[in-house]
Structure formats: C-alpha cells, structure tokens
C-alpha cells in the first residue's frame, strides 16, 4: 500500500473516532524502501499532516527497533527522537523474548522525547508462561515508566477464558494501568476474546476495517463495535465513516490483492495445536517452495513446536519466529535434527538475542553454541556506538536528511538501493511485486544483500555445473537452494581462500537460504577449490567446492 493510497482516506479515518492509528514501524519501514520505493519518514510526516485528531501508533521492537538484530543504544536513542519529531505519538515497545533488558532503553527514550510508551506482553502458551509470570513482567515494565500495557497475541490463541483471567490479574495488580489487547483472527476466536477482555477491564482492542480483516489480520472493526455496543459499551466510532473506509479499502484490495491470497482458508483451527501465527505459516510455505519441498509443510508444522520447546519456548514473533521457523525447516529437510544449524540459531542459543524464557537443555545448548562465547549481560552492552559509523559509511551525495542515516543504520543494503534509485530521479516507480506478501513477511536479518530472484521464488543455479562424479576430490555440496557466499558478512574476509588447507568440520562458506545464513563445513581435510562464484545462486546437491 503506497502512501498516496493512505492519504486519500486518511482524513475520514482521522474523523472516525479511533483511539489510535497504527501506521508505522514493524515491517512497514523496510517494505517502504525495498518494494515501494518510498521514504518511510516522509510517509510518517504526510500522515501526521492529515491525522491531527487521532494519535499515531507504531510497533517498536525494543533494542531491535524495526530490524532483526540488536542495535547500539545511540541508534535507539536517535531513532526515537526523530520518530517523535516527525509525528509519532504511541510506541508499542516489545521484545520477542519478553526480556526486560531489551526494553528498558527504548522505553526510557520514548519517555524522554515525549512519546507514549506502551509496554507489551508477548502472549504465548508453555509450561513457563503463566498468568503469574506475565504479571511479574508487567510490574517490571510499570517500574520502567510505561504509560499503558498491551497484551500482544500474535497467533490468535488467547481464549476468552484465558483473557478474562489474565486481564483480571493485571487490573488487580496494576489497577491504574490502561490495558490494550491485540490479537489475530487466525483461530476465529479473537472477537469473542475481545469481549471477555473488555469485561475484565481492558480499555482498548485492536481491529481492522472489515475489508482488510480476519484470518491473520485483526477482527473486523464494525463487528467488534456491534458486539460491544450490544453489551452497553460506547465505542464512540462514527458508523458512516466506517462504511466509507471499508468501501475504499475493499476497492483498493481488489486492485492490489494477489490472486494466490484468495486461496487462504478464513480460519485455521490448527493454530490451536501448533500455535504458529498465520503470517509465519505463509512464510514457511514460501521458504519450502524455494526448496521445492512444499509437500513437507505438515512435517514442519509438526516439528516446529518441538524445536520451539528445545529453544526454551520463545514467543513466535519477529525475530524469534524466523529463527525457530527456519531451524524447523532445516531439521525436516536435513533428515536429522540440528544436523544443520543457522548462525542465528547459534547466536540465539548463546544469548545474543536475550534471555530465553526457559533454559535450553545443556547438552543441546553446547552443540548449538559451538565456539561462540555465551552472553550473560544485556546483549546491547556489547555493542559499540553505531551512529557515527553509519554516517561515515554513506556516500555524502546519498544523504538528504538525518533520517537517511537512521534508515541506513537499520537496513544498509535496502537503504542504499533506495537511495541509488532516488538519486537517479526516476519519473515512475516500479509496480508493486505480485509476491510482495510472501517476500515481505520476514525480511532478511542477514548482512548480505538479498540477491535478485531469492525473494518469493526458488533460487536457481547456473544452467550447467559439475556433477559429484565430475568433481575432483571430495565435493562440498549445497545443502539447500540459495545463494553462495565466500564470507559470512558484508565486508568480512573470505572464510577460506582457494587452495588453502582446511580441516574437516571447518566452516568454509555460507549458503543464504530462507533469508538466513547456513554455514557450510568441510566434509574432509585437504586443499579446497571453489567451483562457484561469490554471490551466485546454487541448487540443492550442487558441488560448490572440492577438497583434494
């Protein structure tokens, strides 16, 4: 959805009587530059010009800001300041692991610059996620100074009974704290759950206009309003405005919706078993399709809860949903669990993302962590300031405003691509990709640029390549369809030089697949010769190097 699409209906939305309008943050920032060729900061400014009555709200991933890794405190601070200056009002601050250490800096910055800091409880179910544990977390966030609390039910698994119990416990423990509830219609329960939450004391619920609602979206605004008003609650919304808003987006949706999305079932009761958010299932389908293994989706859905339990029951929200999801896919495709482990899984197990809700079994943790040094402090304490370095790394002719430096600090390759396009002063923008939904659901946390063709479709190798039989020496095979890289991060040296002696088990290259890096180890000792150029697409089973 382009900014122009939003602005055409923004005044009507502003006059409808909403408590707030979520319009920024999360994946939208990345998508603006990557796919829409728009400046996300300008989008915020334009919406604020029109929406003067309704507070604007954003999704803020704590120390991850809007990205998929932790950022230094100076970047968190300056990003928050500029977001407030450009019109943001309410910051929903959350951490995928519910680790308070990853929230404190973001919350303090929001408060310092005059924003409304909304704390968040990422809701999930597990032996360690209890009402008592959520109340304890809420009290910690209250002590940090949050202005309100959100119960964030990413998968749509919060039942009416559980909502009544949780909201009731929160209101009892924190009687003055406003409670907001966010859910998805994946399981079909969210509207009923909202009613129970409101009866227990919640003052606000998240909805989507009916033409954009349901399944992995929110419950329909009009229906929830009718339910609440039938029970004597006054929502204060203008029904005529809602009708106009719905008609507008219904027409826009018909023009923009990919034909494939019409095939999605309106309710997935399976989420009550596997607890996987709807958007994550879409991403799993996309990842398996890239590996020509879509028929293995049932196996992955069965494996994922086991992997999640192994990794300490993290809530399935960005970035942990991507880490757990890809590791589950690898466990299925490799035929043996944890035979292949992504760098992100290793870093997660070592504590680089924060404290896991439950401890990882020591033997498995040792295997996953490998040679990484475990992190016991707040992960961001290990990071050097990054704002000056980001500014120095940008060519001067690409910077038009300070916001550009922040965009680059968060998404280096995506921002550079956008700046290059912007400097070319194009007369028209590219059409919005038809496979945008699948490709944008979990953008890459990787340090390499995403290669053309790697988004939304299987990466294909060269038309011809050496077979295992033609390869001299012991072949190093690509374990997945993806993109071959000689280094494990942008700007880093090659992991192994041509002709160098390598040891068995030594990491010699990576294959980027499913938007995460997969280290490839030498199957034998000897001298290595690479058969594929850096940055080229490869297919599963293709020899990428030989050891003699």
Predicted regions span which residues?
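C-terminal helical cap(s) of enzyme catalytic domains, especially alpha/beta-barrels
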Residues: 213-235
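Conserved, mostly hydrophobic/aromatic
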Residues: 13, 93, 149, 201, ...
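Catalytic cores of alpha/beta
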Residues: 129-141, 187-203
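Active-site beta->alpha loop and helix N-cap motifs at the rims of alpha/beta catalytic domains
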Residues: 20, 24-142, 155-159
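Glycine-rich phosphate-binding active-site loops on the catalytic face of alpha/beta enzymes
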Residues: 93, 153, 200-217
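Acidic, low-complexity mobile loops and tails
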Residues: 450-511, 519-527, 531, 540, ...
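Terminal or standalone catalytic/regulatory effector modules within metabolic enzymes
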Residues: 15-32, 263-270, 275-463
């Amino acid at each position: 959805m382009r900014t122009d699409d939003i602005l055409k209906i923004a005044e009507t939305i502003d006059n409808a009587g909403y408590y707030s309008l979520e319009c920024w943050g999360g994946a939208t920032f990345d998508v603006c530059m990557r796919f829409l060729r728009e400046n996300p900061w300008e989008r915020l400014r334009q919406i604020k010009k029109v929406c003067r009555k309704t507070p604007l709200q954003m999704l803020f991933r704590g120390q991850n800001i809007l990205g998929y890794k932790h950022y230094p405190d100076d970047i968190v601070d300056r990003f928050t300041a500029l977001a407030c200056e450009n019109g943001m009002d309410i910051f929903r601050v959350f951490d995928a692991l519910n680790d308070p250490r990853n929230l404190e800096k973001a919350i303090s910055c929001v408060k310092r610059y005059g924003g409304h800091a909304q704390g968040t409880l990422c809701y999930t179910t597990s032996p360690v996620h209890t009402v008592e544990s959520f109340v304890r977390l809420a009290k910690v966030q209250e002590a940090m100074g949050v202005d309100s609390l959100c119960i964030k039910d990413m998968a749509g698994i919060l039942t009416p009974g559980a909502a009544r119990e949780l909201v009731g416990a929160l209101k009892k423990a924190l009687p003055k704290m406003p409670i907001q509830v966010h859910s998805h219609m994946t399981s079909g329960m969210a509207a009923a759950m909202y009613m129970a939450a409101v009866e227990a004391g919640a003052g606000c619920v998240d909805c989507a206009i009916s033409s954009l609602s349901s399944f992995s979206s929110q419950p329909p605004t009009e229906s929830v309003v009718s339910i609440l008003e039938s029970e004597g609650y006054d929502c204060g919304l203008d029904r005529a405005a809602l009708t106009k808003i719905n008609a507008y987006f219904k027409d826009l949706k018909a023009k923009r919706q990919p034909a494939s999305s019409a095939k999605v079932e309106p309710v997935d009761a399976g989420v009550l078993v596997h607890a996987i958010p709807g958007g994550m299932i879409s991403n799993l389908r996309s990842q398996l399709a890239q590996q020509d293994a879509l028929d293995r989706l049932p196996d992955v859905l069965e494996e994922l809860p086991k992997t999640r339990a192994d990794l300490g029951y993290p809530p399935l929200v960005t970035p942990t949903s991507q880490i757990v999801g890809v590791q589950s896919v690898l466990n299925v495709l490799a035929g043996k669990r944890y035979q292949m482990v992504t760098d992100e899984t290793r870093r997660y197990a070592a504590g680089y993302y924060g404290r896991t809700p439950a401890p990882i079994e020591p033997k498995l943790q040792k295997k996953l962590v490998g040679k990484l040094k475990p992190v016991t402090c707040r992960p961001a304490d290990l990071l050097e300031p990054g704002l000056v370095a980001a500014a120095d790394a940008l060519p001067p002719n690409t910077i038009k405003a300070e916001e550009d430096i922040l965009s680059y600090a968060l998404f280096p390759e995506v921002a550079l691509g956008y700046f290059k396009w912007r400097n070319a002063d194009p007369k028209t923008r590219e059409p919005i990709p038809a496979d945008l939904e699948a490709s944008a659901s979990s953008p890459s946390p990787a340090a390499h640029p995403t290669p053309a063709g790697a988004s939304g479709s299987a990466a294909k190798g060269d038309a011809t390549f050496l077979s295992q039989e033609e390869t001299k020496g012991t072949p190093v095979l690509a374990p997945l369809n993806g993109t071959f890289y000689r280094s494990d991060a942008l700007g880093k040296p090659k992991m192994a030089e041509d002709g160098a002696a390598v040891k068995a088990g030594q990491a010699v290259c990576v294959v980027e697949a499913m938007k995460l890096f997969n280290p490839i180890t030498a199957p034998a000792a000897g001298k290595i010769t690479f058969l594929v150029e850096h940055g080229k697409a490869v297919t599963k089973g293709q020899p990428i190097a030989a050891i003699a």
